């Protein structure tokens, strides 16, 4: 699942620039967030590997000026790859321990980590989720108020809504988001609701 999301997000960015894929690319990660247990023996290592391959493909141009820059290409890809398992891990804590809906936790954690990536260790904002939507002029009006981070928040929110509609068999409760159902949820079974 981790690699599928990374490949789809890569395809949403240049050189392919198929921006609608950005709305479905995070869905495999949303499924991992919603599951009661992560699949596989070392799921966070697999997430790091998927993140590494994503950044390795995105940053391929770093090696072009001089052969010695290949070291920086690998090192930067390795550093940036840590953000994907960190995202899934923090969102899982919010969903399964704090009872926050995956629809809320996913965009908040993603945007927070994009902000951190833009300000920690030199600030690297390339290939943000909001950058995939530069052609969707109605959506990028959000950037007037919140910049590319706001656009990325909206894209991740929409992806989380789509991911929330998928059945995930082994969530910790019937709500699909990891939180125990509350009053309004019980009354609206069978309909799509954003809040658990």
What do the PLM-derived regions correspond to, one by one?
Residues 1-174, 184-196:
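Membrane-embedded alpha-helical bundles of multi-pass enzymes
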Residues 179-183:
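Intrinsically disordered, low-complexity segments enriched in serine/threonine/proline/glycine
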């Amino acid at each position: 699942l981790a690699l599928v999301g990374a490949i789809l997000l890569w395809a949403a960015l240049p050189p392919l620039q198929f921006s609608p894929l950005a709305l479905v690319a995070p869905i495999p990660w949303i499924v991992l967030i919603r599951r009661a247990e992560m699949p596989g023996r070392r799921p966070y290592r697999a997430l790091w590997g998927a993140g590494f391959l994503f950044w390795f493909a995105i940053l391929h141009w770093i090696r072009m000026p001089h052969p010695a820059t290949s070291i920086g290409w690998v090192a930067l890809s390795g550093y940036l790859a840590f953000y994907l398992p960190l995202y899934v891990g923090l969102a899982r804590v919010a969903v399964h321990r704090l009872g926050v809906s995956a629809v809320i936790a996913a965009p908040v954690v993603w945007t927070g980590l994009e902000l951190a990536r833009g300000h920690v260790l030199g600030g690297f904002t390339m290939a943000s989720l909001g950058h995939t939507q530069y052609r969707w002029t109605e959506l990028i009006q959000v950037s007037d108020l919140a910049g590319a981070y706001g656009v990325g928040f909206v894209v991740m929110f929409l992806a989380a809504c789509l991911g929330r509609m998928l059945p995930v068999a082994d969530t910790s409760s019937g709500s699909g988001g990891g939180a125990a159902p509350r009053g309004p949820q019980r009354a609206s079974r069978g309909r799509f609701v954003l809040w658990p």
